């Protein structure tokens, strides 16, 4: 779809990865309240928060990311037009490059180790002969947000969840698992709506379900392994020095949390991976600081999520490598615009949230 739109608008293909990153890896992933992205779900068990943590700050961050990204893409497009550059100027691949991406073992390895997905899944499942109307296509997305909100604000709080404190249920609480429950149920309901509205358009629904189930194995096992890795790191004697250094960073706990998450996201090349390790190792410490200082856990949740979506988009990131391969572009052609849109814009939004959160608290 992106290639068709860019070709029709005579927009350079090299800007396509940045445009995709703006829509998938910035405000929709880390800032918009209620987003079902895994990055927004990871902090919930640590801070006892919901997907709608710090909604006001999240909306402000989303506006900053989107406005800055759209501004830069507009500048880049205008500059390309003045130079006489159009869609066909990037011509080393002229067709749909997804088969090449799915067959490239290097691309598959980088994407897989980044806890994203196996690009070979692009070619699995079945495709409908024609797409649904725009209203039917958007409805499942609306169901996710609405169901998530209803579950979080009304259904789960009204339930008797005293049984969760029993050892057989892990001696947990609703605040620790409620966010995960609401996201899971919202996604399940959206899938049911999608299937019900598009059943006749699905030539082989079982093949699509099988492909989706297979694709889910990699992120599930990867996140589980990261939790174990984070626990091992936290148990090392040298970790105390790292923890003291992180907590000693000037600017308060919000800055410390942001720096720790940024560094680990950069090292792992993954937003979810970096945040999982950071919170598994330092989450209890930051939660204790929150209780002692009165700092809102919702604010820490939003700062952690936005921080994870900044330096994760370095050149070795599996999603970046896969996106460039699928779009038929190279790092030399497209990476600068992608960094400005996905990294610099997120950094500006992160600083904005930290400043506003420090001044006014969570809202």
Segments (PLM) and residue ranges:
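Hydrophobic alpha-helical transmembrane segments of multi-pass integral membrane proteins
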Residues: 1-3, 220-233, 247-288, 305
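Alpha-helical transmembrane segments of multi-pass membrane proteins
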Residues: 11-28, 54-59, 63, 253-266, ...
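Re-entrant/interfacial helical elements at transmembrane boundaries that shape
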Residues: 1-5, 34-46, 273-288, 318-327
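Juxtamembrane boundary at the C-terminal end of a transmembrane helix
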Residues: 353-363
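Interfacial loop-to-transmembrane junctions
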Residues: 10, 212-213, 323-344
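Core transmembrane alpha-helical segments of multi-pass membrane transporters/permeases
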Residues: 174-238, 263, 267
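Long, contiguous bundles of hydrophobic transmembrane helices that form the permeation core
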Residues: 56-204, 322, 326-327, 340, ...
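Short amphipathic alpha-helical coupling elements at transmembrane boundaries
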Residues: 3-8, 48, 89, 207-215, ...
């Amino acid at each position: 779809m992106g290639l068709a739109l860019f070709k029709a608008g005579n927009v350079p293909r090299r800007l396509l990865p940045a445009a995709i990153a703006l829509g998938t890896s910035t405000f929709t992933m880390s800032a918009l309240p209620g987003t079902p992205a895994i990055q927004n779900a990871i902090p919930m068990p640590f801070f006892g928060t919901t997907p709608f943590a710090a909604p006001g700050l999240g909306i402000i961050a989303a506006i900053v990311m989107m406005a800055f990204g759209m501004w830069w893409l507009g500048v880049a497009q205008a500059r390309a037009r003045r130079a006489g550059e159009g869609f066909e100027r990037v011509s080393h691949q002229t067709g749909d490059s997804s088969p090449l991406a799915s067959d490239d073992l290097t691309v598959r390895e980088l994407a897989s180790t980044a806890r994203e997905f196996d690009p070979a899944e692009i070619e699995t499942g079945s495709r409908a002969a024609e797409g649904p109307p725009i209203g039917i296509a958007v409805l499942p997305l609306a169901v996710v947000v609405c169901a998530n909100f209803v579950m979080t604000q009304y259904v789960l709080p009204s339930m008797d969840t005293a049984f969760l404190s029993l050892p057989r249920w892990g001696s947990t609480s609703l605040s620790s698992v409620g966010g995960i429950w609401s996201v899971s149920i919202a996604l399940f309901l959206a899938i049911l709506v999608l299937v019900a509205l598009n059943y006749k358009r699905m030539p082989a629904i079982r093949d699509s379900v099988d492909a989706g189930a297979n694709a889910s194995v990699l992120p599930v096992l990867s996140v589980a392994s990261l939790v174990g890795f984070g626990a091992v790191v936290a148990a090392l004697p040298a970790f105390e020095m790292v923890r003291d250094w992180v907590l000693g960073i000037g600017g308060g706990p919000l800055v410390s949390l942001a720096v720790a998450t940024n560094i680990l996201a950069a090292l792992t090349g993954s937003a979810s991976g970096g945040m999982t390790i950071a919170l598994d190792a330092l989450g209890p410490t930051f939660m204790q600081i929150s209780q002692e200082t009165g700092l809102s856990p919702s604010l820490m949740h939003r700062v952690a999520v936005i921080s994870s979506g900044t330096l994760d988009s370095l050149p070795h990131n599996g999603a970046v490598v896969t996106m460039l391969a699928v779009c038929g572009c190279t790092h030399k052609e497209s990476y600068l615009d992608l960094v400005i849109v996905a990294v610099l814009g997120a950094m500006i939004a992160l600083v904005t949230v930290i400043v506003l959160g420090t001044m006014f608290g969570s809202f």
